[in-house]
């Protein structure tokens, strides 16, 4: 009995975080993985190449231009009636708004998700994308940040935001930035300046008054994440920026190891 107790006491469980895995990205347009939100639409279908898998997570983001502050998306929906939550919203302003939504432990068997923009008084332009992920924690939603910026002509400031301290070291950070630019053919978006990011899509040409970028990274510390995009000087006072970011905890497994007894 004494030996058994000693054996149990001598074993310790240490949490080990396995990297979250990207399963697939919606792929509706050009460039890859971006769906253009057309002028005057109230819904937009986001289509995947394969059916979604039971138990996985889906993260969606959208950014759009609208001529007044009436631009507002409601929650996404799908045929499996999965429940989506709004993880980040840059907030209402004229010309630009960005969102991030997510749903977890999904009921799969579907290959499309609908983004909803009801009640608009006019048309809008924008971009959106959705990704399916596996390997997130059972309760993955952690923190996030959002911001807007109203520029002036020749201004190279950007919408930036900083998350709160993360709940754990290993988290997925997912951001979408949108820029309403005065028919600029290339806004020269760059990756966020802090950390190493993977781009999901990037639209540099704002010929329809709408440029955008979605980006993600995995953290290795609980330090707050600073998100700051770079771009060219704004060509007009009507230009606007918005950014929305959310963080998601990665699932942990336990690794047993021996502890030397003193």
Q: What are the language-model segments listed below?
A:
Residues 1-20:
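Sec-dependent, cleavable N-terminal signal peptides
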Residues 17-262:
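Primarily extracytoplasmic/secreted proteins
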């Amino acid at each position: 009995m004494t030996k058994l107790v000693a054996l149990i006491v001598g074993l310790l469980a240490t949490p080990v975080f396995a990297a979250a895995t990207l399963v697939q990205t919606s792929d509706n347009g050009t460039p890859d993985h971006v769906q253009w939100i057309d002028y005057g639409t109230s819904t937009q279908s986001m289509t995947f190449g394969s059916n979604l898998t039971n138990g996985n997570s889906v993260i969606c983001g959208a950014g759009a231009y609208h001529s007044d502050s009436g631009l507002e998306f409601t929650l996404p929906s799908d045929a499996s009636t999965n429940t989506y939550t709004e993880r980040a919203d840059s907030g209402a302003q004229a010309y630009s708004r960005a969102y991030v939504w997510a749903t977890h432990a999904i009921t799969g068997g579907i290959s499309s998700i609908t983004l909803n923009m009801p009640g608009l008084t006019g048309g809008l332009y924008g971009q959106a994308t959705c990704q399916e992920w596996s390997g997130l924690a059972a309760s993955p939603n952690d923190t996030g940040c959002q911001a807007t910026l109203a520029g002036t002509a020749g201004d190279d400031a950007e919408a930036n935001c900083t998350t709160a301290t993360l709940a754990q070291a290993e988290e997925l950070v997912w951001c979408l930035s949108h820029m309403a630019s005065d028919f600029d053919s290339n806004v020269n978006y760059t990756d966020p300046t802090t950390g190493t990011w993977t781009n999901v899509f990037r639209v540099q040409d704002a010929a329809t008054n709408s440029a955008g970028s979605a980006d993600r990274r995995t953290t290795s510390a609980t330090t707050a994440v600073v998100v700051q995009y770079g771009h060219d000087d704004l060509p007009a006072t009507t230009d606007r920026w918005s950014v929305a970011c959310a963080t998601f905890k990665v699932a942990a497994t336990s690794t047993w190891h021996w502890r030397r007894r003193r």
